[in-house]
């Protein structure tokens, strides 16, 4: 249900899933990484109050698609803050993986 790159809700806060293994997820909550059971995550389905809906520039859209293609991740962000978080969290990892080919 949750894949790396997905946003989810944990303890009523929006988090991003970094990895999943053995029914656990490593999540990033702000700048804190932690591991939680997948069963403790909830689907992220509503734009947070006061956040702008997604209207990506061509460069942002290209970057998100490239990260997803390189890392096999799925972007499910709903607001512009999610776009920034996703790119900031995974861009360098994506570049390193592409260079390692």
Task: Go through each PLM region and give its residues.
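Intrinsically disordered, low-complexity, charged/polar segments
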Residues: 30-54
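Basic helix-extension-helix modules of the SAP/HeH family
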Residues: 50-100
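Short beta-strand-centered aromatic/proline hotspots
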Residues: 13-21
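Short coil-to-beta transition motif at edge beta-strands of beta-rich domains
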Residues: 1-11
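SH3/SH3-like beta-barrel fold
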Residues: 25-29
């Amino acid at each position: 249900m949750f894949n790396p790159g997905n946003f989810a809700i944990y303890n009523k806060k929006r988090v991003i899933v970094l990895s999943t293994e053995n029914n656990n997820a490593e999540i990033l909550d702000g700048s804190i990484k932690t591991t939680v059971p997948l069963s403790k995550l909830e689907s992220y389905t509503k734009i947070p109050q006061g956040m702008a809906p997604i209207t990506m520039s061509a460069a942002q859209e290209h970057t998100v698609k490239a990260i997803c293609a390189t890392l096999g991740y799925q972007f499910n962000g709903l607001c512009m803050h999610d776009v920034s978080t996703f790119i900031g969290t995974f861009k360098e990892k994506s570049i390193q993986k592409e260079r390692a080919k």
